[in-house]
């Protein structure tokens, strides 16, 4: 059985400021650095053999902290990037016009083929993050990889493993530096292939950050 751990990056400056990040970037806050160190301590106990990370700055930094604790090299994979949020990237959420807010809401309310202008659809996101996960099956026998990615990207990945369409209403909360695990297995009582073992575990964090849309 292949076990793959999924970690969302630590809290960033734009998370704290309620700005839309997408594939734009901002650095980890002091709290985000602390979260990354806490998840690294947890990861060290899991026997991680490979760290595969989105190549955006916030995931790079989170992955670096985890890699140092685990003694692993990092493989960067652009397929693990966050959803491209087009013309709304870098914008403060409270500054959006009614039309712009409607574009944003399409990504979370189950709108088929919803997308922000110049951005990605949830199906496009799903195709690439699932392809990145499938690549883990090519690792040597006995590998235990950890993927560092983003909130919407990982939420979409876990939801599609559960059989939901990529564009389904977003109902899975994955906080900064939460840990999820998915397994590839053959089972008598589960569908063959990928299954979700756990999602959004934050028991290793002292004080989880609020999601940027809850502030």
From Swiss-Prot:
UniProt KW keywords: Glycolysis, Isomerase
Molecular-function GO term, any one: phosphatase activity
SMART domains: PGAM
PROSITE patterns: PG_MUTASE (PS00175)
Reactions that this protein is recorded to catalyse: (2R)-2-phosphoglycerate = (2R)-3-phosphoglycerate
Source organism superkingdom: Bacteria
GO cellular component terms given for this protein: cytoplasm
EC category name: isomerase
Site feature location: Transition state stabilizer: 150
Entry keyword Isomerase: yes
Binding site for substrate: 8-15, 21-22, 58, 60, 82-85, 104-105, 151-152
EC identifiers of the protein: 5.4.2.-
Catalytic residues in the record: 9 (tele-phosphohistidine intermediate), 82 (proton donor/acceptor)
GO biological process: glycolytic process
Recorded family membership: Belongs to the phosphoglycerate mutase family. GpmB subfamily.
Protein's UniProt name: Probable phosphoglycerate mutase GpmB
Gene encoding the protein: gpmB
């Amino acid at each position: 059985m292949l076990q793959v751990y999924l970690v969302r990056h630590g809290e960033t400056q734009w998370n704290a400021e309620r700005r839309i990040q997408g594939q734009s970037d901002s650095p980890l806050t002091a709290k985000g650095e602390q979260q990354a160190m806490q998840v690294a301590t947890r990861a060290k106990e899991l026997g991680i053999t490979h760290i595969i990370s989105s190549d955006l700055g916030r995931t790079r930094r989170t992955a670096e902290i985890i890699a140092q604790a685990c003694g692993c090299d990092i493989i960067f994979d652009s397929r693990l990037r966050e959803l491209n949020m087009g013309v709304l990237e870098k914008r403060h959420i409270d500054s959006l016009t009614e039309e712009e807010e409607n574009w944003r809401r399409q990504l979370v309310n189950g709108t088929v083929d919803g997308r922000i202008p110049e951005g990605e659809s949830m199906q496009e996101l799903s195709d690439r993050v699932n392809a990145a996960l499938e690549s883990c099956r090519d690792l040597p026998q006995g590998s235990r990889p950890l993927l560092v990615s983003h909130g919407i990207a990982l939420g979409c990945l876990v939801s599609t493993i559960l059989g939901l369409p990529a564009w389904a209403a977003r109902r899975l909360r994955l906080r900064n530096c939460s840990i999820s695990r998915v397994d590839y297995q053959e089972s008598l009582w589960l569908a063959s292939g990928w299954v979700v073992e756990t999602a959004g575990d934050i028991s290793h964090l002292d004080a989880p950050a609020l999601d940027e849309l809850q502030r």
